[in-house]
Structure formats: C-alpha cells, structure tokens
Regions:
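The canonical Cys-X-X-Cys-His
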Residues: 46-54, 108, 148-158, 212
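C-terminal capping alpha-helices of c-type cytochrome domains
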Residues: 98-122, 134, 200-235
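Acidic (E/D-rich), amphipathic helical modules within compact regulatory domains
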Residues: 62-67, 73, 77-136
Length: 249
C-alpha cells in the first residue's frame, strides 16, 4: 500500500510543477509589457483550475485531481490550512497555498462551494464482485467487529457530505480515494486532533481500501448531490474538525 501511495502522488507531481512554473512565467511576462489581464477571482485561481477544472469539476480521466465543486466551504478552507501547516503533504499544493491569507482561502473556498456542475466518471479498476460487495458493506454498514464505522455514518446517508466540514465522497475517482486512505495510514495526510479518519484508515486492511475505493467510485449519483444539513448525523468517533458538538462548532 505504501508503494502505491507514493506512486499515486508521484505521477502527477511533475506535471503540476511544470504547470505552476508556466503560470508564474506567464504572469511575469504580462507584467513586463503584455496587455493587462482583468483582476478577477477566476483569473487569480487559474493555478487551482488548471488541475481541478474551470469550475472545480475535477479532471476526468486523471484519477488524481478531485472535484472541488459543491464541497462544503469550511472543508475546503481546512484542507488549504492543512497544506500550509504540514498536516497534509503534497508539494504542489503546499507551494500553491503557502502565502494565502485566511480571508483569501475563504474567498476561494466559497467560490468552489457555490459551483454546481455535472459530475464526470473516471475509469474503474478491474475488481471482483466479492471486492465490490465487501466495499459496499464497509461503506454502508462498516465492520463492527473491527470497530470500523460505515462511511455513511459521517459522510451522510447518500455520501454527499454534511455541512459545514464533511466532504462528499460520491463522484470521486478510485485512484484519488485509494491514495487518500493510504495517505492517512502513512501519515502524509492528517487534520486537527483527534483525527478520526486516521483512526479509521489504520483499521482498514489494504484489501479493504481497494474495496472501499472501488465501491465509492462505482456508486451511482443520488438525485440530490448537495451536502446534508449540519447536525443531521452523529459521528461515531471523536473528530477534531467537527468540534465539540459534532457539527463543526
């Protein structure tokens, strides 16, 4: 699993670095005498949309750059903060957000949270029916004997997320889901303590991670893909990002 996780991060790394360098070089060229570009939010977040899509829809076929559109704004802000403070490791993102103010991160997050664009589907890996069945069990019911809660117990009954801080899982690519679960196991992704996702990920086996990622990536989208209302779920584990009340406050 550790090898796969490193590969998942290594493949897009060089591409992202080249894109960031190209964008910065282009900005310097414009400053040197090219026509002035309007200073709009859309122009300033081009470094985001280059990988995550013009409206945060993700990058179909890549498997590595997740959808941002419609995610709770507080969740998106928290992820940028985690890249800033080292709780989440991915060099291109760490570089991109390193000097952003909290107010600017909130502005970016609110922009992407407000985007409502169609979902795209990424290719699925060849997995057995038994693997998909195991994944569906973990997603919907968990594994009480191993103290593994269901994904739905935190991410909502339709896995569309819960306001204000829990992201949706539907529509995410298999490669991204697998890589993130692996990152929690290898401590390259973390968040405010107590880190409930790190606890859950470390109770999953490598085969469980394959099963969960495959089951989530193959799920049909619900009719309503909006995040559930705050307070509509009771988390089964203490989660620092959800605060004392379990709803982010």
């Amino acid at each position: 699993m550790n090898t796969n996780t490193r590969l998942h991060h290594a493949k897009p790394f060089g591409v992202v670095v080249l894109l960031v360098v190209a964008i910065l070089f282009s900005a310097a060229s414009r400053a040197a005498g090219a026509p002035t570009v309007p200073d709009t939010l859309q122009q300033r977040i081009i470094v985001c949309t280059t990988c995550h899509g013009m409206h945060g829809e993700g990058t179909p076929g890549s498997g590595y750059f997740p959808r941002l559109a419609g995610k709770p704004a507080a969740y998106l802000v928290r992820q940028m903060q985690n890249f800033q403070n080292g709780l989440r490791k991915y060099a291109p993102m760490e570089y991109t957000v390193r000097q952003l103010s909290l107010a600017y991160m909130q502005e970016i997050a609110e922009y992407f949270a407000a985007q409502q664009v169609p979902y795209s589907r990424s290719p699925l890996p060849p997995v057995s029916a038994a693997t998909l069945q195991r994944g569906e069990q973990l997603v919907s019911k968990g594994d009480p004997a191993r103290k593994i809660p269901a994904c739905a117990s935190c991410h909502g009954s339709q896995l569309t997320g819960v306001q204000p801080s829990t992201p949706g899982l539907v529509g995410l690519p298999y490669d991204y889901l697998s890589a993130q679960l692996g990152s929690w196991r290898t401590h390259t992704r973390g968040t405010v303590a107590p880190d409930c996702m790190a606890v859950v990920a470390n109770r999953l086996s490598a085969s469980d991670i394959t099963a969960v990622a495959a089951a989530l990536a193959s799920r049909q989208l619900p009719a309503d893909t909006h995040a559930q209302a705050a307070g509509s779920v009771t988390p089964p584990l203490p989660c620092g990002v959800l605060g004392a009340t379990g709803d982010g406050t």
